[in-house]
Design a protein with these regions (language model features):
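Polar/charged low-complexity regulatory segments
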Residues: 2-40, 89, 93-145
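Residue-identity detector for glutamine
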Residues: 5, 63-66, 84, 92
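Amphipathic alpha-helical packing elements
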Residues: 35-78
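Short alpha-helix boundary/capping elements
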Residues: 53-57, 85, 101, 119
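A diffuse structural propensity rather than consistent per-protein peaks
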Residues: 56, 69-70, 86, 125-128
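A short structural micro-motif
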Residues: 67-71, 83-84, 99, 117
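Mature extracellular/secreted ectodomains of secretory-pathway proteins
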Residues: 70-79, 83-93
């Protein structure tokens, strides 16, 4: 996984019902390979998954370093997570994360500034954190805001 050449998967992509998980796995693989670029593994957004699932980011990284595919990593997570959630709870958490908006003026101002810098000052559809991440990934790799 080379995140200097293309972005990680969208935070909206799900694995085992979890949003964020495929994206953080892409970042983990890139960190292991030394090709993380501007991305960060175990960033605050990733930690929301780790906290909810009850998974240690270093333990997960050890599993990923063994070359496991997404399905095998998910199986390891399900066996080793400290917070046992039902499918419904995972779906609700994922839906909440997917629709989460900046909760304070500082965060909202940060997103508005970054969207404007990307040439999207008139974009009224960038409301959630996931909207912002998708736009940022797109623009970073040559797309138009």
């Amino acid at each position: 996984m080379n995140l200097t050449q293309r972005p990680p998967r969208s935070p909206r992509v799900r694995l085992g019902g979890y949003v964020l998980l495929p994206r953080l796995l892409d970042k983990c693989r890139a960190e292991i390979a030394g090709t993380l670029g501007e991305y960060h593994y175990n960033c605050p957004m990733d930690r929301r998954f780790f906290d909810f699932a009850g998974v240690d980011h270093e333990a997960l990284k050890t599993q990923v370093a063994q070359g496991l595919g997404d399905g095998s990593v998910l199986a390891w997570i399900l066996e080793n997570r400290t917070h046992q959630h039902s499918e419904w709870e995972i779906a609700q958490w994922s839906a909440h994360r997917e629709t989460a908006v900046p909760a304070d003026n500082e965060s909202r101002s940060f997103i508005n500034e970054k969207v404007a810098e990307a040439g999207g000052a008139d974009r009224e559809d960038i409301g959630t954190w996931f909207d912002f991440l998708d736009l940022d990934d797109h623009v970073t790799f040559g797309g138009k805001a």
